[in-house]
Amino acid sequence: MTYSEQHLKEASEILTKLDTDAIEGMAALLVRVRADGGRLFFLGVGGSAGNCSHAVNDFRKIVGIEAYAPTDNVSELTARTNDEGWDTVFIEWLKISRLNDKDAVFVFSVGGGNLEKNVSPNLVRALQHAKSVGAAITGVVGRDGGFTATV
């Protein structure tokens, strides 16, 4: 079997394992956010921050949802990290953005956040805040899903 054939075979197997109900639920959530005039805040670190930037572009341009990613503003991100710490960088950004119950937070993360293991504690704290103000939470996470999968 060639490399290409093997890759396509594996990709096909992965596609059959996707949770289509979860995907439909995510789509319905995004439709509601747009209909309610809510905003979409993308959170991610490392390579996932790059995915967030791309998603902001697509959701604003193609879907027509007001969307933002705090990692797109490097000067604010680094100032907050320096002055307030990495653990709270996203929660403080969401607070100043007045995250509310019409909005949604969308996480891209392999680990999904875990305070005990010190995996993306900034995501966990941001999601705790999102939950406290009634914002919807969704995301694309790795197998374990971390804290993101529990909210």
Model-inferred region functions:
Residues G139-V151:
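Short, glycine/polar-rich helix-capping loops at beta-to-alpha or helix-loop-helix junctions
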Residues R32-A104:
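Glycine-rich, small/polar surface segments that engage phosphate groups of diverse ligands
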